[in-house]
Swiss-Prot record:
Species assigned in the record: Danio rerio (Zebrafish)
SUPFAM superfamilies: EGF/Laminin (SSF57196)
Stretches with biased composition (Low complexity): 132-144, 311-323
Keywords, alphabetical: Calcium, Cell junction, Cell membrane, Developmental protein, Disulfide bond, EGF-like domain, Glycoprotein, Membrane, Repeat, Secreted, Signal, Transmembrane, Transmembrane helix
Disulfide cysteine pairs (residue numbers): C591-C602, C596-C612, C614-C623, C630-C641, C635-C650, C652-C664
Pfam families xrefs: EGF_CA
Protein name: Protein HEG
Knockout mutant characteristics: Death at embryonic stages due to heart growth defects.
Record field: compositional bias (Basic and acidic residues): 112-122, 367-384
One of the record's GO molecular function terms: calcium ion binding
């Protein structure tokens, strides 16, 4: 038994040692056997990263190398531009330019005049008939933007932001294209005066006029001014008796095509009368009307009139013939067909006293509309009265005509012979582009439709002198001559109408074709004489149109008209217009309004040649080459110079704005995109209107926030038209991305046709959504520990829960480390027993608390086991003696008991009787075996009742009697007999 107990004690000691080892393993100072291993490596993406590890655990700390990583993390390729305006140029709009997420935009053309200068050529077919029926027609194909027709009397001052047009004092028709606030105005003029190539005309002795004209070349719009000297001398003497007789009236009725939207028409009736004259239209007086064909065309690369159009006057006379003059464009040679949509009839009436003869010429013009253009067609017409207006001679073409009505000897100045009767002669300067004369015989009566232009002139007998250069005064014998001019200009929308009956026209006089090379004047001479109605004298022949080339720089075109009566003599002055002619030393470089582009001026050198004096932003022989201003680095530090047509712009990175043109400062930036879902009919002009409405919407939506600076618009192609928007606020503003979106969305939801910014939105289903500034700037946040957020208008790397940044501008986040926890942005220590990241681990609690408690419990269990084992060995005899409450039977039960006691210690002497008198003589404690004696005696005599260990069934003779003081010792055993 002792050996068994020893083994158990050793086992208990081993368990104690094991528990001690376990406790040391989980304790804080148990890492001495496992040294910490540290590994450091550098990554370009995340910076310097250090990893510390030991068996079973690993902790990582990341630090950013600002010296190398910052360049990549702050790389923001997107940009916003501001275009700097230069002197002499129209201001360029602000630009937005980015190179991330298709935010790159560029706006270099002026919004106002982008589509005002049409590239479409006007091609004319002119047909004139001088015999009965007398008619002239021409067809015009043109394209113009939406225009507004006004007269001088209706509009006293046209002011649109930075453009102001002076008021005209003569009867002129202004055709102006008026845009909204902040945009420019293109002004076209139709003038009925003696001043060719002018806009603002007035009859005076000498006047210097300025004609603004606009030109768009290479995306840049420049405003040029050209000064013309106009000298006009008109002497008038009026007799009250001839007020109703000597009156000139003109009526213009025009029908415009209404296929394009947004056309506005205003009608006025200006009237200019001399002395006490009144408006008279006498249709009962005999008339003599020379036919007049008025053509207009736009010239893209050659010189033009004050509104970039060339006006050509053509008068022909033939016997039952029509003169067709095809006008050939410098770029296109397209002849439009005549349609019944835009006609005009010109009727001249001349009062000759008692005569009742009259002749009428009609002019019909037809406008053929281009299907791909949707804007109002405009025909620049110039009416002729006693004082006529002619455009500058753009190309000098020598034309040889045979069989003419008027003959001039070669080398002599052309003269105008007098007719037999009272003659009304019109001298019209004519400038055409390579005219070709074609004769056709026709006797049909022409019926024209659409707009009608009627010019009625009532004058006495006229004697016209020869054209004189420069200032001319013509002495005529006139009695009580009165010059009264009354112009009535009416612009009406009418239905097609039929022209008046055209009487015959009679021509007479010497006829000779001539080309006067020595003449300095390009003229068209026409002689007419009246006859009684019904009697027509037809003379076959061709119209004579002499042209001449002249080397002088200026040519004076003199138109002199005299009126004759029978009583008095009046000296009538002449109106003189001096116009510069295009003369150049080299045939390829001539001086004209469009010779020098982009605001350049044509200057004549001392040698007689012409050259272009360009503005500082342009260069080249024709001022068409842009100067790269970015070579001189004009932009401040931090911005990028972008060269544009005629200027340059300084662009800051996206998220920055140019502050006072000096430096790029950081601003709050919010990105968004307007999407036009229905862009089927959206053309360039519609896109311009869409931009204007979006600007109004953004100004109304964003100006309510504090710190609002500006916004920029761009264009991005995709499914539908997409217009990116960059809205900028100052850093002091507390606006957020949600505020901007809600304000714009509210404006769109409240949109109706009563608002100014809504028609396009309702038509094209305009919508707005927010774009990510983080994606546009490619902000490099550490995706493992942070997320990019642009809610405040500034890209910010928002740390995940449990991480923090030492500086707000840092791109990476870090943790507090082991044993610390982030609380309100500060790192605090963990509670007892907790550690790890953000105090989420409790291994310390296990090592410090659980391990000792477990060891103590194990020790208690071991002690209890030892005690239990020892207690079991002591109580085993009870289980041997007593078993289920039954007595053990002695092997000597057959022997009778004796009640007698022998005094001898031997077995033979002891007797016991069974009677009751001697039964209790022996007590349980009276009989003892002598251990030595007993053992020796029993073993010697062979009477030992058992041979086994104590506790066997042979341990006692009489099982019913047992000594309770028996010890488990072989030397102390007692038997009962």
């Amino acid at each position: 038994m002792m050996e068994t107990c020893a083994r158990r004690v050793l086992f208990t000691a081993a368990l104690l040692v094991l528990s001690t080892v376990i406790a040391e393993t989980f304790s804080t100072d148990s890492d001495t056997d496992n040294p910490l291993s540290t590994e450091t490596f550098y990554s370009r993406a995340s910076g310097l990263k250090q990893t510390s590890s030991w068996p079973g655990r690993e902790a990582t700390a990341t630090a950013v190398d600002l010296s190398s990583g910052l360049g990549e993390m702050t790389e923001i390729p997107a940009s916003v531009s501001i275009t700097a305006a230069r002197e002499g140029h129209s201001p360029k709009p602000l630009q937005t330019s980015t190179n991330a997420a298709d935010w790159k935009t560029s706006t270099t053309s002026d919004e106002t005049t982008e589509h005002l200068q049409s590239d479409t050529e006007l091609t004319h077919n002119a047909t004139a008939q001088w015999e009965s029926p007398s008619s002239a027609s021409h067809s015009i194909t043109s394209h113009h933007p939406v225009t507004e027709t006004r007269t001088v009397r209706d509009v006293t001052d046209l002011i649109d932001m930075d453009t102001t047009d002076s008021v005209s004092h003569t009867d002129s028709t202004y055709i102006s294209t008026t845009n909204r606030v902040g945009e420019r105005t293109l002004l076209s003029v139709i003038s009925n005066s003696t001043f060719a190539y002018t806009q603002n005309s007035s009859i005076s002795d000498a006047e210097s006029q300025t004609s603004p004209w606009e030109e768009k070349t290479s995306g840049a719009t420049q405003v040029n001014e050209e000064t013309e000297e106009t000298v006009s001398t008109v002497s008038e003497q009026t007799d009250p008796t001839f007020e109703g007789r000597n009156t000139t009236s003109a009526t213009l009725e025009t029908e415009r095509s209404t296929l394009s939207q947004g056309t506005e028409s205003q009608t006025g009736q200006p009237s200019v009368t001399g002395q006490t004259a009144k408006e008279v239209t006498d249709i009962d007086n005999p008339n003599s009307t020379p036919p007049l064909t008025v053509t207009s065309r736009d010239v893209e690369e050659t010189d033009a009139t004050s509104v970039s159009s060339e006006t050509s006057y053509t008068q022909t006379s033939s016997d039952s013939a029509s003169s067709i003059l095809p006008f050939t464009s410098s770029e296109h040679n397209v002849t439009s067909t005549s349609q019944e949509s835009h006609n005009s009839t010109l009727i001249y009436s001349t009062n000759t006293g008692g005569s009742t003869e009259f002749s009428t010429g009609s002019v019909s013009s037809t406008a053929h509309e281009e299907t791909e253009r949707s804007s109002t067609r405009i025909v620049d017409e110039t009416t002729l009265h006693d004082v006529t207006s002619a455009p500058p001679v753009l190309e000098d073409v020598a034309t040889t005509i045979d069989d003419s009505l008027s003959k001039f000897p070669s080398g002599q100045s052309p003269t105008i012979p007098k007719t037999d009767d009272q003659t009304n002669t019109q001298v019209v300067p004519t400038s055409t582009h390579r005219p070709q004369v074609t004769d056709e015989a026709t006797d049909e009566v022409s019926t024209v439709y659409s707009s009608t232009t009627t010019l009625t002139t009532t004058t006495p007998s006229v004697t016209t002198r020869q054209l004189q250069p420069h200032y001319t005064t013509v002495q005529t014998q006139t009695q009580h001559t009165t010059i009264v001019t009354t112009d009535i200009i009416q612009v009406l929308r009418t239905t097609p109408s039929t022209a008046h009956h055209v009487p015959t026209l009679t021509t007479s006089g010497p006829q000779a074709p001539s080309t006067a090379d020595s003449s300095d004047v390009t003229t068209l001479h026409l002689e007419t004489s009246t006859a009684t109605p019904g009697n027509t004298t037809a003379h076959g022949g061709r119209a004579t149109t002499p042209f001449s080339k002249s080397s002088p720089g200026r040519t004076t075109v003199v138109v002199t008209t005299g009126h004759l009566t029978d009583k008095s003599t009046t000296e009538t002055g002449s109106a003189t217009t001096q116009m510069p002619l295009r003369t150049s030393a080299s045939p390829g470089h001539v001086c004209g309004p469009k010779t020098c582009a982009n605001g350049g001026h044509c200057v004549r050198s001392a040698e007689g040649s012409y050259y272009c004096q360009c503005l500082s932003a342009w260069t080249g022989p024709f001022c068409t080459e842009d100067v790269d201003e970015c070579v001189n680095s004009p932009c401040p530090q931090g911005s990028v110079c972008v060269n544009t047509g005629g200027s340059f712009s300084c662009e800051c990175d996206l998220g920055f704005d140019l502050e006072d043109g000096r430096s790029c400062t950081q601003v709050k930036t919010f990105l968004g995109t307007f999407t036009v879902n229905n862009s089927l009919h959206l053309r360039n002009l519609g896109l311009h209107e869409l931009h204007r409405e979006i600007q109004q919407l953004l100004n109304a939506s964003l100006s309510i926030f504090h710190g609002y600076r500006r916004f920029t618009l761009g264009k991005r192609d995709g499914q539908g038209v997409q217009i990116p928007v960059v809205s900028m606020f100052s850093l002091s503003s507390n606006v957020t991305s949600a505020d901007v979106f809600n304000s714009i969305q509210m404006s769109l939801n409240n949109c109706s046709r009563t608002y100014s910014h809504c028609p396009i939105k309702l038509q094209h289903q305009l919508s707005y959504h927010v774009e990510s500034l983080c994606m546009a700037q490619k902000t490099k946040c550490d995706v493992q520990y942070s997320d990019c957020s642009d809610i405040s208008g500034i890209p910010n790397c928002q740390c995940l829960p449990g991480y923090f940044k030492r500086n707000p501008e840092d791109m990476t986040c870090r943790d507090c480390g082991d044993g610390l926890k982030l609380v309100n942005g500060k790192c605090v220590e963990c509670m007892f027993g907790f550690g790890g990241f953000n105090c989420n681990n409790f291994y310390k609690l296990i090592a410090v608390v659980v391990s000792p408690a477990g060891g103590a419990l194990l020790l208690i269990v071991v002690i209890a086991l030892i005690v239990t084992c020892c207690k079991k060995d002591k109580n085993d005899i009870n289980k041997i003696i007593f078993k289920s409450g039954e007595l053990q039977m002695s092997p000597y039960a057959e022997f009778p008991k004796s009640n007698r006691v022998s005094m001898e210690w031997g077995r033979e002497t002891i007797e016991m009787q069974e009677n009751g008198s001697t039964k209790n003589l022996l007590q349980m404690t009276d009989i003892y075996y002598s251990p030595a004696l007993r053992n020796s005696d029993l073993e010697r005599n062979g009477l030992y009742p058992f041979s086994g260990l104590p506790g066997s069934r042979h341990s006692c003779i009489y099982p019913a009697q047992w000594n309770p003081s028996f010890l488990s010792d072989d030397s102390r055993r007692r038997d009962y007999f």
